[in-house]
Amino acid sequence: MCHQTVGLAARHLEAHGIPTVIMGCAKDIVEHCGVPRFLFSDFPLGNSGGRPFDVESQAQTLALALRVLESAPAARTTLQSPLRWNADGSWKLDYLDLTKLSPERIAERRKEFDEVKTVARAKREAS
């Protein structure tokens, strides 16, 4: 879900007395929304809950988020997760850099994405 949408939903919930904490990867967007509590993970977008298939990192991320929820000293508190996507941060150099992909690879990825959307649409329409 969009970081901005989550941030705005959190502000609405907080205005009605429901405490929230956001787990996110887009620090600039979430902080701009002015959320009360935010656990920032310096991971690629879509991985706010920890590394894929890494239950330990996911559990640690959730534990940190709950800690932020119960102990944030003030509104608009941000805590940065100590977890790293990889040791040297090199993922940032390649993440979404289309200049590093051949036109064939871009077409292949687009085809894969379209196939996933087709499956999702069929499931949505079947329900």
Give the location of each predicted region.
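Surface-exposed loop/turn and secondary-structure junction residues enriched for glycine/proline
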Residues: H32-C33, S48, P82
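A charged, well-structured terminal subsegment
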Residues: S48-T77
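Extended, histidine- and acidic-residue-enriched regions that form the cofactor-binding/catalytic faces
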Residues: R67-S127
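Alpha-helix N-cap/helix-initiation motif
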Residues: C2-H3, D54
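Short, acidic/turn-prone active-site loops that include or flank metal/cofactor-
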Residues: C25-K27, F43-G46
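A short acidic, often aromatic-flanked loop/helix-cap motif at beta-alpha or helix-coil junctions
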Residues: L45-G50, N86
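Short, hinge-like loop/turn segments at secondary-structure boundaries
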Residues: R37-D42
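Short, acidic/small-residue loops that bind anionic groups at enzyme active sites
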Residues: H3-C33
